[in-house]
Amino acid sequence: MEVIEGRKLVSHRSVFVRFPIRDKDQEYLLVWTTTPWTLTSNVVVAVNVNLEYVKLKSSDGSIYYFAKDNLEYQRLEKQFAEKKQWIDGVPKLKTIAQIFKEHGGYEVLGSVKGSDLVGLEYIGPYDDLDAQNTAGGYPYVNEDLEKNGITSVMQHKVIDPGKDKIGNDIVVSGEGT
């Protein structure tokens, strides 16, 4: 039996996480992750300094920043359309615009360059835990993601997620918002 024959395609939840921006009331960085179990080890949000990020106001007055191209982007559209790497019965993913519309609507206030986000600080989801608590929060950083073969426009990262028995990283950076 080939190893591939023993593989099984399973579904799990992906999540959107809003990271409060320190010293900005009701302003958040919005990140989508397909690996929510890594959020406990989250230490930095990476942005692409060359991209435009939308500044969106939701119906509750909260302001969100995420890659402008992702507002109407249909995540995993190719996999859904081809039924390749897609489980029967799992619905098509909604765009961010659809999600905000379903929750009362939104208004686009403008856009900012990714470089304008560098240096802002956010509050991580587990910063209240002693092991995660770092004075001042974690800064946005400028990383050359493309050079590292990562094409997502924003993502959360972990420190030392571990390695398998042959030395490969167990957790690698995935698609983000």
What are these regions (language model features)?
Residues M1-T177:
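NTP-handling and nucleic-acid-processing catalytic cores
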